[in-house]
Structure formats: C-alpha cells, structure tokens
Amino acid sequence: ADKSTDMATPVLRLDRKSYNLFSEDRKSDRVGGTTVVFDKHMCALYFSKELIPFFEISKIGSDEQLPCYHHVGVYAYRKNILKDYLRWPESNLEKLEGLEQLRFLFENKRVKCVEVNSKGRVFWELNNPQDVQLIEKVLF
C-alpha cells in the first residue's frame, strides 16, 4: 500500500451512453452522479456534480475513449485521516458541491483514484426519481 495515500476511491471511465445520461441530468437541472479529474499519479484534483473536464464530444472520434470519469462513491480511508476529518471544518467548495471528499482535497490530502472496469455493465446511482427506471432496467 502507498503510505502517502490518505484515502482511495474507485472511478469508472464514462462511455458514451453514461456520458449522455450525465448530460441529460444536467440539462434537466437534475443533480446526479459525481465526476472526478486526477493527476498523472491518479490522485484526485477535483470532484464535481458537473461533468468535468469540459470537452466537446463532437471533437472526439467514435473509437476514442472519453476523458471523463464517474466517481463510484465508495472509499477506503486510513484510520487517522478519519479522525482528522471530524476536526476539519467544511470548506466552501464542499458546501457548494455537497461533496464530502472535497474536504480532504481542501486539506491537501491525497485521494487516490483507482480505475475499475464495469465489464460492459451500466453503472448508475439512485439520485433522482428518474433514476429508478434506469436502474430497474439494468436489474431486471
């Protein structure tokens, strides 16, 4: 284990279908999943309820992977960092986005992103009433 990592979390690269679902949510003023950008060492730079990074999908070839990652929302923490978390005040960004992991970034802690493979399955979270139908379609 990397001793310099304070926390780890899985991420999924968005395929076009998932990207379109995210886009539809935002265009309809629904807040849904979280996306993340990270550095060359896979350490998170920022998490957002918006699609990040910005890019024009029309400029990405149909055979190219999208540069956008969905944060799965599961964490592995070091014990001491959880104790520290309780002492830190909410940052303005955490309050604005409603994302607790931003507190770690604000405190300059390393959040390692681990890319996982959905093996062709659709991954979607239950954030809005409209999500139920999509999730039921996947399950049944």
Outline where the language-model segments fall.
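Conserved alpha/beta core of the MobA/IspD/sugar-nucleotide pyrophosphorylase nucleotidyltransferase superfamily
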Residues: F47, I60-F140
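Conserved core of the sugar-phosphate nucleotidyltransferase
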Residues: A1-W88
